Amino acid sequence: RRMEEGIYDHEEYAKAMAWTEKYCKPNEGEDFKNRPEKRKTREEKDADWEFIVKMTIIMRDLMVGNPKLLEMGFKEEAIGHNAIAAGFQGQRQWTDWKPNGDFSEALLNTTFDWNGIREAYVLATENDACNGVAMLFGHLLSGCGQMFSDIRTYWSPEAVKRVTGKELTGMAKNGIIHLINSGATTLDATGESHNEAGEPCMKPNWEMTEADVEACLKATTWYPADRDYFRGGGFSSNFLSKGGMPVTMMRLNLVKGLGPVLQLAEGWTVDIDPEIHQVLNMRTDPT
């Protein structure tokens, strides 16, 4: 309804599109996942960009409200839900028909957007409430944006050698967990921000700089969504995180007969041979 009836700040939308045209569309990736007959035309992709920018504004307005909507005569919509966290369920009722939520989720989970540097929102992919709670814990404890990603694969040293002919070294020598398949991951997780020692890191919003913002955007490619999964299209974020960042993975599970159980795993991001990364990245879906 908000989309169809234009219930969003049209001035902000114009500002957001100008920002997206400058920082995101130039990094649109090649449409290599879709068969030629499934690829959208340039005009259709441009329309998708416009749609997902509006989606982002509307999702934020639903969470926290927007006084501009009151000026437009939409008193109830202007209030929002005073949400500390939210989620978006797309598959398949939405994504079979409309562009997916990856861009909106990635950007809202990030510490900046077209309005500048700000606190990251907490928005769970596929309305995964348990993961949303874990993301909220992480955000409130650290002040940082939270990385939502699939634990797709554990790659043992032997498996990496078998499929690539190369060996993992350094901190990766005992094997790696490949976090992939989430085009909704916060751009802060690129690791393009650096601390005072020059080490890659994820910063709380009050430590972010304009240089950090531009570096995170530059490191992110927006690939057209795989239309075998997302018939409605959209764009998904893709990047390779810098190695050397300490990270904590969290997951809240509901165990029958026990209740909520929080899993924690501490580790590090690692740099690996680019040729190894290319092979592993293409084993599932880079988008």
Language-model features: where?
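Anaerobic metallocofactor- and corrinoid-dependent redox/one-carbon enzyme cores
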Residues: H10-E43, W49-T287
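Terminal amphipathic helices with adjacent charged low-complexity linkers/tails
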Residues: R1-E12
